[in-house]
Amino acid sequence: MNKKKVILSISGHDPSGGAGLQTDILTSNFFNLHCVSSLTCQTVQTTKKLFKLDPTKVKFFKQNIDHIIKSTNLSGIKIGVVPNRDIACEIIKIISSLKIPVVIDPIFFAGGGGKFTNKKDLSFLRDSFYPHSSILTPNIEAVSYTHLRAHETY
């Protein structure tokens, strides 16, 4: 029997179920992957509005990931919402040590409106965090913040 490959989803919690860890887990299951996760933030939001974002404490985030890494043979990492520079710096340390594929899906805004990342941290993400990805997959709204050029595919 083949064991499922394991991916680590590092993202936020969307209580409306439209994004974040919930959709990463669903997508992983669709592709017959086992998804383990670490929460970057919790949000209070609906499909129409982001009311509040509460970043995970860095110490807690680090402990969670350290235990996942020790107990799991990861095949890859998928990163979504990174709410601040502190979490980003911790993720950089982690992905630099693992040497596995990393997909970063930069998320700056909630679907219903509201920012996930402040302007100062956005510059850090663009200049120092995104270069650590194997693949960067911004949606069309996020492309301008990454300073990449969008290419249409038909």
Model-derived features: positions:
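General structural feature for long, well-ordered alpha-helical segments within catalytic domains
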Residues: 6, 57-64, 84-91, 121, ...
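Non-cysteine beta-strand/loop elements that form the S-adenosyl-L-methionine
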Residues: 36-39, 103-105, 133-140
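Residues at the N-termini of beta-strands
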Residues: 75-76, 135
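Single conserved hydrophobic/aromatic residue that forms the stacking wall/gate
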Residues: 147-154
